[in-house]
Amino acid sequence: GWSSAGRFHHAQSQLHRFLNCIGGYTKSKFTYSFAAAETIVPHILGSFREFLDTSTSWESILENTKFFVCLGGIPLKNGQISQGGVGKHFQREKLIEASKSNISFVNISPLKGDLLDEVKGEWLSPRPNTDTALLLGIAHTLHQNGLTDIAFLEKYTQGYEKFLEYVLGETDGIPKTTNWAAAICEIDAVTIENLAKKMARNRTMISVSWSLTRQDHGEQPFWMAITVAAMLGQIGLPGGGIGFGYSATNFVGGQFTIPPAVALPQGRNPVSSFIPVARISDLLLHPNGTFDFDGKEYNYPETKIVYWAGGNPFHHHQDLGRLMQAWQKPDTIICNEWCWNSLAKRSDIVLPCNTPLEREDIALTPRDPYVVKMSCLIESYGESKTDFEIFQGIARAMGVESKFTGEKTSTDWIEWLYEETQKKAVA
């Protein structure tokens, strides 16, 4: 997990560095935030994370966008944070500016609060997990009304003919009409039709919330939203096309000079086995079993020890009952925790780590223009230690202390991170 905005006392980095010093580990692939998108988008657009970092800026939206379609909303509560910390908050400011510049918003979410009230956007409340059906109804309307940009599709896409056969029901006998979509998503057919026409007649930005990936078949809403954006022919136009997760964290849509932040070196993991991030239960319940991922078949390794730091699987994993069953399988579960939470209560060994208030660090990220000194405000409580100190002690007992610390103290490492970032910025 993140655990802290600090660049050095980042629990995952510390854990991975330690494990690589003692022979490696089975890693998790992708993130709980948007793993389905990380898997599907490279097959359609390219690297998902690169697309996030180069999202259409709010400045371009303010100058060019006329209609902003918010699938999953633009929840400002999420935009208060970002990986590595936030110095420049701008999501609320830009939303209000956009509303004052006559950009029309529609919040397509079961939650009205997923779009700022001051924006005065329209609210459409679909049944949860039906966004793809809604988008298929929009696609059908665009085609039936001659609103599809055929020239764009022919020049920049492949496979539209196959997709159209599905939309028209030629492959399964079910035309994806607005009436069909309405019965599933519980937004009436006329509203869906009007939404599609408004999208076609305006410079439209489609924003897809990361939350849409964290549902059954979570890759489908992203794939379908990209398809609708392609049908509109506005991908690549200023203020048009598609964006992923405006205000999912603060940085999406930002435009500023970014320091090229340096991270703590983690070393090389000699172990090739991995699991998709949300399949911990499957890993523990089915050792040596097979699983399909991104078009290939892999095997779950046999797992005897689980080590968790900086996060809590009982907070963000799905199907907690099944996770509880799986949690009984390993021989030993170790965690670094600062409080007696659900993870600590279910671990065999709990090593008390301190909080960001009890250590020195530096907040530094390639997604924010600020570098922030994080001062230690209080002494470490009781026997708690930093993650670095915890792993240093274990590494000492295992004979790899020098390899783990790099013969540096935590202060040395923080200074090194700052100095190396300075060098990259100058270069």
Language-model features: locations:
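Catalytic alpha/large subunits of respiratory electron-transfer oxidoreductases
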Residues: 1-346, 350-358, 394, 398
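Long, low-complexity segments enriched in small/aliphatic residues
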Residues: 254-257, 414-427
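Catalytic cores of transferase enzymes with a strong primary signal for eukaryotic protein kinases
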Residues: 69, 408-412, 427
